[in-house]
């Protein structure tokens, strides 16, 4: 069974973070990919509207929740 919050039938969900001029990364969206290399390529192509200084992707399944809504 696929956990729809972490995966889709097309692949894993990756969260995309980037920064332009500010010192901290900001969440800018998400992509779906079958592996890390595709996730990087999809993020770079999909979110190319700025000249980002830094961009990173992380599998949603790798995010550890500290405080969650009840």
Residue ranges and their predicted role:
Residues 4-26:
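Short aromatic-glycine-(Arg/Gly/Cys) micro-motifs in beta-strand/loop hairpins
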Residues 34-52:
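A short, charged, amphipathic alpha-helix used as a generic interaction element across diverse proteins
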Residues 2, 47-70:
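Short, mixed-charge low-complexity intrinsically disordered segments
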Residues 25-34:
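A short, exposed loop/beta-hairpin motif centered on an aromatic-Gly-Thr core
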Residues 1-3, 41-42:
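Glycine-rich, charged/polar anion/phosphate-binding loops
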Residues 26, 41, 65-67:
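Short acidic, gly/pro-rich beta-turn/loop elements at beta-sheet edges
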